[in-house]
């Protein structure tokens, strides 16, 4: 090992010498495409060896840095550049490989193209869908901004599906209603057939090319640069050559996506590893509501690939082994278009009670073949292809085998509706200076305990834009960037070096699989205290096993072994907070369904008139947000709670929706 390490140090010294010429030497080859940090701004980069003589560190300075280049990150980045800010965007993937591309169904907005609609009805549905854990000021902001956001996308060139008279086509989607739940099913979901995320991401990427944003493509963000409680940028690893980069900025936006890969079966990309959530945790800041994990009702059985809710919006139905449309029993009004948590639980109950399909009776069927073939070809072309590839099913002739699959994380980095990251001190929310978050990485909280389908793409564009607007309101391009310590980021580099030379007994892939299976078995659609407690013990033990990892690639150029190990560290922090938060929450709400605590525990019993009832103390009810912290050294999880925000931004224009019994 000493020989390997010595050779590595020699190579590192050579890289340091090369790095000193880095600001003036352009890379060659086609990989420079859309990599504008290689352009005229390179002169602003400076090499520092103050962290480590073995790891070259290149310092950069920008007005703002965005971490992540999915829908939320792109919208924030080009919004800042458009406003004149010198902006960097750090992404471990080429932008169009981000997980936004996998979203299928659509984006909600009360355009009223199919029938009369109102954004306040959308607001009501979102609050109800959140099981009254959503913050109503943020939901007000998102739903009111939705129509303008969709029109903006259309103006950018997004090729929405159209009605015969040329308007944007809107399909039915789960949990959507008219007239505050009293007017029947709403058609509010704007779509591009069943490839809406693909079109949205490519549209935003195309728009981003108009602006002079510096893209650090295939750079892995290691940690935030924090000084005196303020965020002053990010430190990142260049995956291509192994150099370390400190990107100092007055404003940092975290848009790194979710942490779906904490589970064994999920629709998330393999890169959805909770990087931003973990960076926040290592910075000593809280994460919020991580126990609320959405299981999408229709993942392909055995593969986990997403089958959009748009199938049911177009008229598809779920059936059990008896050919029964079973959702009529669980949600008599909405049926197959009930909220996702309701449908996933109903499917699980059907399987438990022996009405599952297939030889093992462990899934149900999604039937589409009763729909006209031309409708399937025009509205659901991607699903037809996916079902054939991953299930061997011709959707015009036979049903698709489906099973609830982890799909979305309602929890994340706590923010207000302006995208500003929050900490909770002495019972009060405080803004973390210089730090913003948006997209699935953030928890605004517009989704509460359960997200409505087609609100995620809306979340991306509305709050990506909101982050840019917030920074524009509080800063000016060229404002002085606060300094950082000469050794800022030293711990991140030490951790990287430790993992690079890790020589334990457990492979990264083995430990990751153990974590994923433990989460799948102990924190699934239905949860129970004894199983959650066992899961807490198992995940804590697995977290301790990180010290026994073994990596095999000691190099620094395209070391995917090292990157996957860094991602595993991030996933472990997310898994800890998810399962400990779930064990502590002694109720059922939204996607968090406890079999030992089957009811929602609010400050009042909303199944009865509240007149004459005594309000439960904050400590005795669960209509509150979980805030979780992790001691990174020991893996100990600490939980706190903060109130849900019930007030809207303007009560006269949009009244608060009081809690009620949630049914569909």
UniProtKB/Swiss-Prot annotation:
The active site is at 340 (proton acceptor). Pathway: Carbohydrate metabolism; tricarboxylic acid cycle; fumarate from succinate (eukaryal route): step 1/1. One of its GO terms (molecular function) is electron transfer activity. Changing residue 509 to L: In MC2DN1; uncertain significance. Its EC number is 1.3.5.1, 1.1.5.-. Oxaloacetate binds at residues 296, 340, 407, 451, 454. The modification N6-acetyllysine is found at residues 167, 179, 182, 250, 335, 480, 485, 498, 517, 538, 541, 547, 550, 598, 608, 624, 636, 647. One of its GO terms (biological process) is tricarboxylic acid cycle. Phosphorylation at Tyr-215 is important for efficient electron transfer in complex II and the prevention of ROS generation. Acetylated. Deacetylated by SIRT3. Component of complex II composed of four subunits: the flavoprotein (FP) SDHA, iron-sulfur protein (IP) SDHB, and a cytochrome b560 composed of SDHC and SDHD. Interacts with SDHAF2/SDH5; interaction is required for FAD attachment. Interacts with TRAP1. Interacts with LACC1. This is Succinate dehydrogenase [ubiquinone] flavoprotein subunit, mitochondrial. It comes from Homo sapiens. The lineage of its organism: Eukaryota, Metazoa, Chordata, Craniata, Vertebrata.
